[in-house]
């Protein structure tokens, strides 16, 4: 049996691909594994990130962009079919992320592209305009195994990074960066005819060359669940609101708006995706419905639909304030996504 394993996904579903990755990682033996894949339009966040802070969730919902939480750390990234994704897995002591980084750099060299590793998890290219990032990575280790996964920007729609990601201004300032868009680059700028299949072939060849052996590719089809232990359960988890949103760290959120009938300040404390405390302050001449709303919100999931349902119930209880509460409902629907 080969010491290597190569898997290639034909699915563009981020939840499907991340479930495949997780199941392979759980069941892996002593083989060195390479998994190649890509996602349709998705924002992928790190295991411990807060999507409401990191992403423009309202814009994502409007545009049909999925949110996917991965099992590794690191920051939020936007994927489309202009990205190629790779995952290297190995048992310890054979796991070494510098080896997998070297394989990616060698693959790029085969394509005529000279890149270097920078910082903890980036691959960059030196240009006349400065250093440009073309790849980002994240890592995960357990006691006996580890994986390194990342993306390569081929011809991604870089303008959409700003549409869906909320970059931390302190992080940008600390790195001396003016914007996310200005520091990233597509590989197509350096090799105009580059394609996902070219990149996959180059990474595969560099993988085989490094270890001095080959393995037949296993194609993962989106039409049939792969023969992986507990895949259906893992796919259901990766697809769930509870995993992608509800696993966010505890946080607080303040919303405020001025309506014709009065100003409203709403304070939320959210844990595990559910509202655990709500306070509403208003100068409305009829505050009773809003005081009741604060009570009703406790225990609701932090989703616009759940808050809208509370408002619907409130309108039934306070029909004389239906116009004001309908306006409040619409505002909450637009503000919380």
UniProtKB/Swiss-Prot annotation:
Q: Which reaction does this enzyme catalyse, per its entry? A: L-lysyl-[lipoyl-carrier protein] + (R)-lipoate + ATP = N(6)-[(R)-lipoyl]-L-lysyl-[lipoyl-carrier protein] + AMP + diphosphate + H(+)
Q: Which residues bind (R)-lipoate?
A: 133
Question: Native species of this protein?
Answer: Serratia proteamaculans (strain 568)
- The protein's name: Lipoate-protein ligase A
Q: Which family does it belong to?
A: Belongs to the LplA family.
Main function: Catalyzes both the ATP-dependent activation of exogenously supplied lipoate to lipoyl-AMP and the transfer of the activated lipoyl onto the lipoyl domains of lipoate-dependent enzymes.
Q: Misc remark for this entry?
A: In the transfer reaction, the free carboxyl group of lipoic acid is attached via an amide linkage to the epsilon-amino group of a specific lysine residue of lipoyl domains of lipoate-dependent enzymes.
The UniProt record lists the keyword Cytoplasm: yes
Q: How does it assemble?
A: Monomer.
**Gene Ontology CC terms, in alphabetical order:** cytosol
Listed InterPro entries: aa-tRNA-synth_II/BPL/LPL, BPL_LPL_catalytic, Lipoate_ligase_A, Lipoate_protein_ligase_C, LipoylTrfase_LipoateP_Ligase
Q: Where in the cell is it found?
A: Cytoplasm
Which pathway does UniProt place it in?
A: Protein modification; protein lipoylation via exogenous pathway; protein N(6)-(lipoyl)lysine from lipoate: step 1/2; Protein modification; protein lipoylation via exogenous pathway; protein N(6)-(lipoyl)lysine from lipoate: step 2/2
Q: Does the keyword RNA-binding apply?
A: no
Note the CDD domains from the entry.
Answer: LplA
Q: Give the BPL/LPL catalytic domain ranges.
A: 28-215
Q: What HAMAP family does the record tag this protein with?
A: LplA (MF_01602)
Q: Where does ATP bind?
A: 70, 75-78, 133
The superkingdom of the source organism is: Bacteria
Where this protein primarily resides, as one coarse class? cytoplasm
């Amino acid at each position: 049996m080969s010491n290597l394993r190569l898997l290639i996904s034909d699915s563009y579903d981020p939840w499907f691909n991340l479930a495949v990755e997780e199941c392979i990682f759980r069941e892996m033996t002593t083989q060195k594994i390479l998994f190649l894949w890509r996602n349709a339009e998705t924002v992928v966040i790190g295991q411990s990130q807060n999507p409401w802070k990191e992403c423009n969730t309202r814009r994502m919902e409007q545009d049909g962009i999925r949110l996917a939480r991965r099992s590794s750390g690191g920051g939020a990234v936007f994927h489309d079919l202009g990205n190629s994704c790779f995952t290297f897995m190995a048992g310890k002591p054979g796991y070494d992320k510098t080896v997998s980084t070297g394989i990616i750099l060698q693959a790029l060299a085969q394509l005529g592209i000279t890149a270097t590793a920078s910082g903890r998890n980036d691959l960059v290219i030196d240009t006349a305009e400065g250093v440009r990032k073309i790849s980002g990575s994240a890592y995960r280790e357990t006691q006996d195994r580890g994986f390194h996964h990342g993306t390569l920007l081929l011809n991604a729609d870089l303008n959409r990074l700003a549409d869906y990601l909320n970059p931390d201004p302190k992080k940008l300032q600390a790195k001396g960066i003016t914007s996310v868009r200005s520091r990233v680059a597509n590989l197509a700028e350096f090799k105009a005819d580059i394609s996902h299949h070219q990149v996959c072939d180059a990474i595969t060849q560099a993988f085989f060359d490094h270890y001095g052996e080959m393995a037949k590719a296993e194609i993962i089809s989106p039409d049939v669940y792969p023969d992986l232990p507990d895949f259906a359960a893992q796919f259901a988890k990766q697809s769930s609101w509870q995993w992608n949103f509800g696993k966010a760290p505890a946080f607080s959120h303040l919303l405020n708006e001025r309506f014709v009938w009065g100003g409203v300040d709403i304070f939320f404390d959210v844990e595990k995706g559910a509202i655990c405390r709500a306070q509403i302050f208003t100068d409305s001449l009829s505050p009773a419905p809003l005081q009741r709303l604060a009570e009703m919100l406790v225990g609701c999931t932090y989703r616009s639909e759940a808050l809208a349902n509370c408002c619907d119930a409130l309108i039934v209880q306070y029909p004389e304030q239906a116009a004001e509460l309908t306006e409040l409902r619409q505002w909450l629907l637009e503000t919380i996504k």
